[in-house]
UniProtKB/Swiss-Prot annotation:
GO terms for molecular function: DNA binding; DNA-binding transcription factor activity. One of its GO terms (biological process) is 3,4-dihydroxybenzoate metabolic process. InterPro entries: GAF-like_dom_sf (IPR029016), HTH_MetabolicPath_Reg (IPR050707), PcaR_PcaU (IPR012794), Tscrpt_reg_IclR_C (IPR014757), Tscrpt_reg_IclR_N (IPR005471), WH-like_DNA-bd_sf (IPR036388), WH_DNA-bd_sf (IPR036390). Residues 53-72 bind DNA. It comes from Acinetobacter baylyi (strain ATCC 33305 / BD413 / ADP1). It comes from the Bacteria. This is Pca operon regulatory protein.
Length: 278
């Protein structure tokens, strides 16, 4: 006979846990084929515009035969195109982002406020949310007469940036509880991107504590040289931080003092307006 402990163990073994979003699913409800197909799509990125069968297999952990079948299926469905050697994403993939941006509340209500900030200052603003290792741009504005040769990061919707090296990402991490912060660091070791990037866990946790205490984050050249940024939290229901509002600018155009003295109050006021709407 099974003991209660054995029965509990069996039940636990049938539950899958997603360490990134904390979701759970029963094993019998999990469709491995969909998971593998999405793993193929996830293998593409801003630094990987094309994949061959070998690269796809290495990125996903599949066999070459399995990777080939999934690539060919996605090509058949219209999400990939191939030149005979490499596979590329097609515009059809944008239907998912379009559906999200058209239906999600935060991007829609943020956009006019971001546009107003740009009209007032001719600087670039965005709203970002945390997704695992990265912060994702879900709304943004761009100065109409931006002429700087430096092209700061985070200028297009859907752009994904390492959370530990950006002002918005650090805001989002700062408002996680201590356990969640430690879990994040355990799962995503701090990678050096420039000589200014934080790579020591103790120093980084201390920084997150300071950011939460002051309620805003300034970041300079931690992700990209010649670029600095400022971010504040956006609160949703139950006083929970749901996103970050930030400004990104070339260091040759604005100073740290200007951002903190003149732009920070505008960010804080806009974040308050968004909180009232949300």
């Amino acid at each position: 006979m099974w003991s209660n402990m054995d029965d509990k163990k069996v039940k636990e073994e049938k539950i899958l846990h997603n360490s990134t979003n904390k979701k759970i699913i029963r094993h019998e409800d999990f469709v491995a084929g969909i998971s593998k197909g999405m793993a193929i799509l996830d293998s593409f990125g801003t630094d990987r515009h094309r994949l061959n069968i070998t690269m796809a297999a290495e990125k996903t952990g599949m066999t070459r035969a399995a990777a080939r079948r999934h690539l060919l299926t996605l090509e058949y469905l219209g999400y990939l195109e191939s030149d005979g050697h490499y596979f590329y994403l097609t515009p059809k993939i944008l239907k998912f982002s379009g559906s999200y941006l058209g239906g999600a509340q935060l991007p829609k209500i943020s956009q006019p406020l971001l546009n107003l900030l740009t009209t007032q200052t001719s600087l670039i603003y965005s709203v970002m949310v945390l997704d695992g290792y990265e912060a994702i741009t879900i709304a943004r504005s761009a100065a109409h007469q931006q002429t700087d040769r430096v092209n700061p990061y985070g200028l297009h919707l859907g752009n994904r940036l390492p959370a530990h090296a950006t002002s918005a990402g650090k805001i989002l991490l700062a408002y996680l509880d201590d356990h969640a912060q430690q879990e994040w660091l355990n799962q995503y070791p701090l990678q050096r991107l420039t000589k200014y990037t934080y790579t020591n866990n103790i120093d980084f946790l201390r920084l997150l504590s300071e950011i939460k205490e002051q309620g805003w984050c300034y970041s300079s050249e931690e992700h990209e040289l010649g670029v600095h940024a400022l971010a504040v939290p956006i609160y949703g229901q139950q006083s929970r931080v749901v996103a970050a509002l930030n400004i990104v600018s070339p260091t040759m155009r604005t100073t740290k003092e200007y951002l903190i003295q003149h732009i920070l109050p505008l960010l804080q006021e806009t974040a308050r307006e968004l909180r009232n709407i949300l």
